[in-house]
Amino acid sequence: MSDLLLFDLDGTLVDTTDLILQSFAWTFDAHLPGRLPSRRDLVATFGRSLPAALRELAAEQGATDPEALAAEMLVTYRDFQRQHHDTLIQPFPGIADALAALHAEGHRLGVVTSKMQHFARRGMQLFDLERYFDVAVFHDDVTRHKPHPEPLLEAARRAGVEPSSAIYIGDSTHDIVAGRAAAMRTVAVLWGPFDREVLEAARPDAMVSSPSELVELPTRLQVR
């Protein structure tokens, strides 16, 4: 039996790509009109702390004071999400069934996300996913965020397990880097916005192409 299976949220359990991209578009139109980064550049920030991503993007677009501008952009971004969150997200098909099966087998499950607790919990509650998780770590809970391992280490601490006994499952390179840094086994899912080649370069321990394969992970990675 696995000691702990930890999941990223956005792009792994819940499809939030449209919400995130539209939030960025609205925010840049308000603060840096005509300078919206490419979809590829925006997707590359997925999985990171939003404040850090906005600072980096603002600097790349020539902002004279990226720190101050990013703070203003953050307010606009979150205002948009509050208004449109529930209508622009959906669960990935098969995710609820996979979580239910793992939970029924007695595996302990957790969520580790760079998302603020309010929005993260709302997304899980909308699709009745929260009941499967024994532990959750949100942006608000730590001072350093993925790809730093702190959020994953905090989840292991709360669960009372050694990090090496845990698996971290995510859709981004930042997830894989964070998991490896935390000495956890890592799994990349292929139904998110990242290309397979990009994820392969991060060297996860396993890759899965459909949620049904998640149920096989404890056996596949020989976790006891």
Which role fits each region the language model picked out?
Residues 91, 112, 144:
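Residue-level marker of regulatory loop/turn positions in helix-turn-helix DNA-binding domains and
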Residues 85-90, 114, 185-186:
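Short, flexible loop segments at the rims of nucleotide/cofactor-binding pockets, characterized by
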Residues 2-97, 105:
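N-terminal helical cap/lid subdomain that shapes the substrate entry/recognition surface
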Residues 17, 108-109, 173, 212:
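Low-complexity, intrinsically disordered short peptide segments enriched in small/polar/basic residues
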Residues 12, 113-115:
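Conserved phosphate-coupling serine/threonine residues in phosphotransfer and NTP-handling enzymes
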